[in-house]
Amino acid sequence: MEFRLPSLPVFLSFLLFFLMLVRHWKRSKGQGKPPPGPKPLPILGNLHQLADGLPHYAVTKLCRKYGPVMKLKLGQLDAVVVSSPEAAKEVLKTNEIKFAQRPEVYAVEIMSYDHSSIVFSPYGDYWREMRKISVLELLSNRRVTSFRSIREDEVWNLVQFISENEGCIINLSERIFTMTNDIISRAAFGNKCDDQHNFTALLEEILQIGAGFAIADLYPSLTFLRPLTGMKPALERIHKKMDKILEEIVTEHQIKRKAAAKNNTEFEEEDLVDTLLNYAEANKNEFHLTTDQVKAVTLDIFSAGSETSATSMEWAMSELLKNPRVMKKAQEEVRQACKGKSKIREADIQNLEYLKLVIKETFRLHAPGPFTPREARETCEIGGYTIPAKAKILINLHAMGRDPTIWKDPECFQPERFEGSSIDFKGNHFELIPFGGGRRICPGISFATANIELGLAQMMYHFDFKLPNGKSLEDLDMDENFGMTCRRKENLQVIATTRIPFEK
């Protein structure tokens, strides 16, 4: 039989097909198995799928479809959403060094003095030193205990305000945020600063635009968009005002220290700014801490300490009002434990086990932030999927807190689910990590928890609450806002009735 060579077109087609196979094999070998996810659109990526409602609800809905490790294209960014305890453990513990970086956020770049804060500084020597300062000096258990009298004073101020406005409509959200701001202001600055109202108003603006879903963050290469969207001038305006306040605070502390040195009198540390300045002086030969870095860390502590405590307390009170059975049980516990007292102290509430369950259940349904962000420092794997270097990792706390495979009746507020359970929220159990986990876990857990426990216990002890204007508990709006933290969309308005009179 006569043998014929294939025609040139057939040969070229076969060669082209073979080369495409080789190219695909090399690419798949280099990239590994990518996580599943919805198909992105040009330019937008998957942003159009997050536009309907709050982003964390939209992301959670997609996670239910595509699994616990899901890829998204957010504008120009490659993002991987992790929504199971097992996958979260791989990020925060198994491969914690590979994911020890925080993704860049444009608002943070401006507000944190070029990433000088503890929360947002790049992983490296500076971050390690600041982490050590925060754990051993600024927010140690000893330091948190030393602020007990401040917490008691400011919570009593809240109780007194509610008592004086008994029967009137109270904006409880506003009063809770005022209380936590006063606590952190006195702990950080030594007193309530003169510009505290302006300071907290500026802070609220930052929290709304600093969640990492702004145009400047989603399209980082398009730097010309920053002034066009108004984000850059807005941030620069906020930073200028906030820097002026922080500069005055730090300068005032430095003047007091110099005066003490000049008079040969011992300077007594009183607040967190003093602690930072003392550390800078004691370690100036090994570690140079600039004034801007002191301001960055101070802002870090104020924003995280105040916002986390207040948001969690606001949601706890909302859930207690929405669930009168739980409210009654919490009230009975604290009223029995502190029976006969006209005011209660922190030492009186250490054994309120049901209150601790209420707080734990609040963290499950209402983590202060819906996502814990990380960035892959190198190519690695999660759940058998290859994660490229520089990918933005979003640990979806919102999804895990509402996952029916983890929690029975996940949408129900049931503190009893934690009775007899060893699950805590301090980074050891990855189904409940409101403060994150691993090396970059929030160092202020003890500080925030102490504020929340005392504030809730005092309100439960002294008052009964109802909704204004004859509203039933079923009418209580539980809608959220989206930002760096997830507050209530509408402020919590209540009417209080005194059950146990307060005497300061």
From Swiss-Prot:
Pathway: Secondary metabolite biosynthesis; terpenoid biosynthesis
Signal peptide: none
EC number assigned by the record: 1.14.14.-
Tissue specificity as recorded in UniProt: Mainly expressed in fruits and leaves.
List of residues binding heme: 442
GO CC aspect terms: membrane
Membrane spanning residue stretches: 2-22
GO molecular function: heme binding; iron ion binding; monooxygenase activity; oxidoreductase activity, acting on paired donors, with incorporation or reduction of molecular oxygen
Cofactor(s) needed by this chain: heme
Keywords: Heme, Iron, Membrane, Metal-binding, Monooxygenase, Oxidoreductase, Transmembrane, Transmembrane helix
Main location: membrane
Protein origin, superkingdom: Eukaryota
Catalytic activity: dihydroniloticin + 2 reduced [NADPH--hemoprotein reductase] + 2 O2 = melianol + 2 oxidized [NADPH--hemoprotein reductase] + 3 H2O + 2 H(+)
Subcellular location: Membrane
Protein topology in the membrane: Single-pass membrane protein
Function noted in UniProt: Monooxygenase involved in the biosynthesis of limonoids triterpene natural products such as azadirachtin, an antifeedant widely used as bioinsecticide, and possessing many medicinal applications including anti-tumoral, anti-malarial, anti-rheumatic, antibacterial, anti-inflammatory, anti-pyretic and diuretic effects. Catalyzes the conversion of dihydroniloticin to the protolimonoid melianol.
Similarity section: Belongs to the cytochrome P450 family.
PANTHER family cross-referenced by the UniProt entry: CYTOCHROME P450 71D11-LIKE, CYTOCHROME P450 FAMILY 71 PROTEIN
Protein name as it appears in the record: Melianol synthase CYP71BQ5
Upper classification of the organism: Eukaryota, Viridiplantae, Streptophyta, Embryophyta, Tracheophyta
